């Protein structure tokens, strides 16, 4: 009996080995038989029924989020792989696996510092991929932990509303319990939302989080860490062609950029480490970090 394998049909645990199955991409794999429902099955992984190898798919993700266009990745594959992939397929991989990894990374508890900077970026997204219907002004709201350089929470939203900002702040509160100070720009919506999200302690008569406002128009300087992160993000997104006219596509791609920034990209200020190595020290990733994150999600 093999107890660690569970039947996908009836969730039964009375499983025995029943031969093998061999495919061109996956090679030889063990097949199992459930004694409860008489179903034969192969344990599925996130790449089930994908027509390309996990190594090729994760290579496409890495090249795309490092700066290559989908057609640039396609040309790269044409030179090194016998079976090429269409540029639209590469974009679908980026969307699909970004959201899949995000379902895992968004629920991680972080060991952050006590200081967070929060800001937003304006983006112009095409209203339609094919029709000429103009552009729509959207917002990318994000936050960074100063100590670990980890992008704690982010959201690509249609409007810079109070609910959208509260959504980002609520995720910060869920992920880390160390926050003592949050710095924002002079947007008036931040003042009430920060106080309401983190609450007030009646005993000490004090808000649980200090809210600092840095207004550049008054000569008070900038939130340099979050602005530096924005420069890195802009370097990648400046070549995007209107996010293909889809709010969902924009959200998925920006999630992929967040994952790349936190878990893949090494930072010189962190002495060659990724932010996740400091913020999530228990998470051990191998050389192919994309593959490890997909398998964990």
Question: What does each model-found stretch correspond to?
Answer:
Residues 64, 130-161, 169-171:
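Short conserved beta-strand segments at catalytic cores or DNA/RNA-binding microdomains
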Residues 186-244:
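Helix-centered, glycine/charged polyanion-binding patches within enzymatic domains
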Residues 240-243, 247-297:
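C-terminal domain-tail junction helix/linker
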Residues 50-52, 96, 154-177:
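Active-site beta-loop-alpha junctions of metal-dependent nucleic acid enzymes
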Residues 1-6, 27-30:
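Short metal-coordination and nucleic-acid-contact micro-motifs, chiefly zinc-binding Cys/His arrays
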Residues 30-114, 122-130, 148:
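Short, positively charged, Gly/Tyr-enriched micro-motifs
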Residues 7-10, 34:
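Short cysteine-rich clusters marking metal-coordination/redox-active sites
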Residues 11-26:
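Short recognition patches in nucleic-acid-associated and regulatory proteins
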